[in-house]
Amino acid sequence: MDKIIVKGGNTRLSGEVVIEGAKNAVLPLLAATILASEGQTTLTNVPILSDVYTMNNVVRGLDIAVDFDEENNTVVVDASGEILDQAPYEYVSKMRASIVVLGPILARNGHAKVSMPGGCTIGSRPIDLHLKGLEAMGAKITQVGGDITATAEKLKGATIYMDFPSVGATQNLMMAATLADGVTTIENAAREPEIVDLAILLNEMGANVKGAGTEKLVIKGVKSLHGTQHAVIQDRIEAGTFMVAAAMTSGNVLIKDAIWEHNRPLISKLLEMGVDVKEEDRGIRVKSDVSKLKPVAVKTLPHPGFPTDMQAQFTALMAVVKGKSSISETVFENRFQHLEEMRRMGLHSEILRDTAMIHGGLPLQGARVMSTDLRASAALILTGMVAEGTTTVGKLTHLDRGYYKFHEKLAKLGAQISRVSEA
């Protein structure tokens, strides 16, 4: 198993960094290719991540041809033949996002069987919203032995109100609705850029999806969808991670091809803190002087609020800003596990229900720490850059799910960082 070693204390990042295609966009895009009963679908700007390999294998398991050209960051999918209706447990069980294949398989075949991903229970909010929406469209749902089975000879258009704007549920229902009879309206839909990207692909495939990026989606069902070519949007979370890295190291970094509008919630908090953030022709430039930054209060919310996937990294930034900052997590429960690891590095923090209080500007020391999830992995590495001494970050399987050559990109910006194999 690999580990990352960071020598910190005087790191100051500078230069340019290239952002990959968005992990949170490409996974549902790959699921959408299942719907194309004619021709091939080509996705470009595909990131080389373990989650992408997993989703490719989920789609392959349906007897669909998938060709991943890593050198050119391109995936070609041919789903034009008959496809299977059961997603492979071996791969579905590895990744929560794999549940988004349920809607496309059901819409295409009239029957779908998918194991519950990641061991989550049927009553948990995200899975519940997926199933309620499909039931509203006429599907019969059963759960036996950890498997979800959905049956509908033909899905019917429906009006669906979501109790929470779940990204995954919105994506699943959008895809299912493209081949349903009639019109489907999704109220309180998720508004993330990844939703818009999916809608663009579906429309390029011949679907009729309107309202993406707003709270109300209207999907008029069509008889069939066909292959197309589509470029995956840039990863706003990777871009945000490097913005935070530049800010907390008093750096000067150009995040190439980052999209200002996609990152506006994060940028607004960086500006409030005193970070210099500017849009340039080639991306977003971040300059900072940590000694002049001010503490802030942050609350994670569904888009266009502050992204929960930036919460851990922003905590790392708060740790170096003198004064008392707070960050409230309203999207996911139990997402402060990284703070326990950061306390090993000298972080002073308290957690009261869904809010963490961060006492920033105090000395941090290098330590041996373990990643608890994908974004926590990045946060611990960033903290290691500003802590005195050496930090060793283990359990990198989380990191590889969402960041491509993260340590190499940081090293090119000036970080003293390496990745080594543990004996």
Swiss-Prot record:
Q: In which pathway does it act?
A: Cell wall biogenesis; peptidoglycan biosynthesis
Q: Name one GO molecular function term.
A: UDP-N-acetylglucosamine 1-carboxyvinyltransferase activity
Signal listed as a keyword: no
User: A GO BP term, please?
Assistant: peptidoglycan biosynthetic process
Q: What is its EC number?
A: 2.5.1.7
> Pfam family of this protein, just one?
EPSP_synthase
Q: Does the keyword Cytoplasm apply?
A: yes
Q: Which domain of life is it from?
A: Bacteria
The positions flagged as active site in the entry are C120 (proton donor)
Where's it found, cell-wise? Cytoplasm
Give residues where 2-(S-cysteinyl)pyruvic acid O-phosphothioketal occurs.
C120
Keyword annotations for this protein?
A: Cell cycle, Cell division, Cell shape, Cell wall biogenesis/degradation, Cytoplasm, Peptidoglycan synthesis, Pyruvate, Transferase
Q: Which residues bind phosphoenolpyruvate?
A: K23, N24
Q: Where does UDP-N-acetyl-alpha-D-glucosamine bind?
A: R96, R125, P126, I127, D128, L129, D309, V331
Instruction: Cite the Gene3D superfamilies for this sequence.
Output: Enolpyruvate transferase domain (3.65.10.10)
| Cross-referenced InterPro entries | Enolpyruvate_Tfrase_dom (IPR001986), Enolpyruvate_Tfrase_sf (IPR036968), MurA_subfamily (IPR050068), RNA3'P_cycl/enolpyr_Trfase_a/b (IPR013792), UDP_GlcNAc_COvinyl_MurA (IPR005750)
Q: Which GO cellular component terms are attached? A: cytoplasm
- Which reaction equation describes what this protein catalyses? phosphoenolpyruvate + UDP-N-acetyl-alpha-D-glucosamine = UDP-N-acetyl-3-O-(1-carboxyvinyl)-alpha-D-glucosamine + phosphate
Briefly state the protein's biological role.
Answer: Cell wall formation. Adds enolpyruvyl to UDP-N-acetylglucosamine.
Q: HAMAP family this protein is in? A: MurA
Family of this protein: Belongs to the EPSP synthase family. MurA subfamily.
Q: What is this protein identified as?
A: UDP-N-acetylglucosamine 1-carboxyvinyltransferase 1
